[in-house]
């Protein structure tokens, strides 16, 4: 018989930098998960993506064991990296802070594809373009 899931915890953690301090410790501790075991596993799986924020979805079972699924980095993080800016615009409709090319947009959409609710790459590109627009980043041809 399958184990019963008692909680699903969603966290956004910098790759390779999971440690038992807040916010990770308290989020896992209240469900009785072995925090160090999670941190070691997460850091091992994300070692190749160092410096990027990698969201994770942790399923905690009734016997306090856990499994986790790594998601793709947030579109905003990928867009900021591609545009070479620190943060998005505070007034995206008035002031633009940077721009990305159509090729960069397609690359980001390709990366995000598994986590997006899109059937093809064009739809994924539109979703990512909308995120970029809301950050004050223009898309050039």
Swiss-Prot record:
Function: Forms part of the ribosomal stalk which helps the ribosome interact with GTP-bound translation factors.
Name of the protein this chain belongs to: Large ribosomal subunit protein uL11
Keyword presence, Ribonucleoprotein: yes
Assembly description: Part of the ribosomal stalk of the 50S ribosomal subunit. Interacts with L10 and the large rRNA to form the base of the stalk. L10 forms an elongated spine to which L12 dimers bind in a sequential fashion forming a multimeric L10(L12)X complex.
Keywords from the UniProt entry: Methylation, Ribonucleoprotein, Ribosomal protein, RNA-binding, rRNA-binding
Gene Ontology biological-process entries: translation
PTM note: One or more lysine residues are methylated.
CDD domains: Ribosomal_L11 (cd00349)
Highest taxon in the source lineage: Bacteria
UniProt keyword tRNA processing, yes or no: no
Underlying gene: rplK
Assigned protein family: Belongs to the universal ribosomal protein uL11 family.
């Amino acid at each position: 018989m399958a184990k019963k899931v008692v909680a699903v915890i969603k966290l956004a953690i910098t790759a390779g930098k999971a440690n038992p301090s807040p916010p990770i410790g308290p989020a896992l501790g209240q469900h009785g998960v072995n925090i160090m075991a999670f941190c070691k596993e997460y850091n091992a799986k994300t070692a190749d993506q160092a410096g990027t924020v990698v969201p994770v979805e942790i399923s905690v079972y009734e016997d306090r064991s856990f499994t986790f699924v790594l998601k793709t980095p947030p579109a905003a993080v990928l867009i900021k990296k591609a545009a070479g800016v620190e943060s998005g615009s505070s007034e995206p409709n008035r002031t633009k802070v940077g721009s990305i090319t159509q090729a960069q947009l397609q690359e980001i959409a390709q990366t995000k594809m598994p986590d997006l609710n899109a059937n093809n790459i064009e739809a994924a590109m539109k979703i990512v373009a909308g995120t970029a627009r809301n950050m004050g980043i223009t898309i050039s041809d």
